[in-house]
Every structure is written in C-alpha cells, then in structure tokens.
C-alpha cells in the first residue's frame, strides 16, 4: 500500500500532462488515470522494486551513437513480463558495427548482473555497412532510366537481410531497397503506395 495515497495522486496529477506531452507524437490519444482498486496479489518488496527501477534507469535505452545525422547504434528496452517467480525484460541492441553492438550488449549484461539479475543473449543479427560499389552506380542508372530522377541512397537503422547474407557471401556486392515509409514502427506508420510498385 502507498503510505500517503493523496500525495501519490497529487504527484501523478502533476506529472501526467508532462508525460502525455512527451508521448504526443507516438500516442496522441494517450490517457493517464488513477483510481483506487482492491488487490490481493503479490507485490515486489520495496528493496526489489528499488533495485529493479534503478537497473531500468541506467540501462542504455534509445540512441547510443549517431554520425552525420544517421543512427549508428541503439539499444531499446522492449518487452517486460512478470510471473510469480521472475521479471523478464527484453532489450534489442542494434548497430551497423558488430563491435559496437557487442560492447552495448556486454554493458547490458553487466548492469543486470550487478543488480542481482541474470542476463543472456538469445539471438542477434549482424550489422551491415553500406559500401560504395559499382552496384550502387548501376542501380542508380537503372532507377534513372525507369523513373527519370536520381535514386535516394540512404542508411537505415534497422535489421536488414544484407547483414545476414554478407556473413555467408562476403565477396558479393549487395544493396537493400524498399518503399518510402514514414513513421516506421509506430501507430502512424505509412507506406507510399507508388514506391512499392
């Protein structure tokens, strides 16, 4: 139970506008409500709650490194699950460079272990850096013939098949291409239909 319910409600009321404002781009219809309910389940001890929140607070979450306006490395806290015996947290670490990805993953492992948790790497996919190769020039030439303008060459901060393929086909030139997408991985995600054709 909260020792001072009125104070807890006051603090939440003071912060909710600030929190909703921060989330307005991704959750424009967000709401925060507080109501008293009965609860007869288990709760974390005060000590465990503090350790867990402190651990969450210092885990790398979000942008880690940018270069020339492009995201190079990030780490995102994703799914949080709880049952009677444990709390499970999934983090996704991504980078164009495997060394940077491994460094951040090692940091996550060490932080969790320092707070008394257990951590493991369940899966990963390799990074991939765009290379300036004749294939890019050829692709641009074909694009120009088909569409009459220059192809946009850009880097994306997502998992691409090229990273997986490059591990097996290291001498093969490759590019990744796709449609024009806005608001990726958000409720407002949109794809420009003409760019899919």
Feature annotation, model-predicted:
Residues 72-74, 78-87, 92, 142-197:
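Zn-dependent metallopeptidase/amidohydrolase metal-coordination segment
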Residues 12, 16-27, 60, 108, ...:
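Structural signal for hydrophobic packing residues in well-ordered secondary-structure cores
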Residues 30-36, 119, 150-153:
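Generic structural signal for residues in well-ordered beta-strands
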Residues 9-11, 48-65, 102-110, 141, ...:
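His/Asp/Glu-rich mid-to-C-terminal helical/loop segments that flank catalytic regions of hydrolases
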Residues 87-105:
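C-terminal catalytic subdomain
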Residues 1-93:
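Midchain, well-structured core segments that form catalytic/ion-binding scaffolds
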Residues 112-146:
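Generic long, charged, amphipathic alpha-helical segments
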Residues 95-96, 126-130, 190:
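Short, contiguous acidic/charged loop-to-helix segments that flank catalytic cores in large enzymes
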């Amino acid at each position: 139970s909260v020792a001072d319910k009125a104070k807890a409600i006051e603090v939440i009321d003071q912060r909710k506008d600030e929190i909703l404002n921060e989330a307005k781009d991704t959750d424009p219809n967000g709401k925060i409500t507080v109501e008293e309910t009965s609860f007869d389940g288990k709760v974390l001890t005060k000590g465990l709650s503090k350790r867990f929140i402190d651990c969450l607070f210092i885990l790398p979450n979000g942008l880690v490194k940018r270069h020339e306006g492009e995201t190079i490395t990030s780490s995102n806290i994703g799914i949080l699950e709880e049952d009677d015996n444990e709390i499970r947290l999934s983090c996704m670490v991504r980078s164009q460079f495997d060394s940077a990805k491994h460094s951040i993953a090692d940091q996550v492992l060490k932080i969790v272990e320092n707070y008394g948790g257990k951590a493991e790497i369940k899966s990963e996919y390799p990074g991939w850096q765009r290379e300036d190769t004749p294939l890019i020039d050829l692709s641009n030439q074909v694009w120009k013939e088909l569409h009459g303008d220059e192809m946009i060459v850009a880097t994306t901060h997502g998992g691409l098949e090229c990273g997986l393929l490059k591990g097996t086909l290291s001498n093969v030139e490759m590019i990744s291409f796709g449609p024009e997408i806005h608001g990726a991985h958000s409720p407002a995600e949109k794809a420009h239909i003409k760019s899919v054709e």
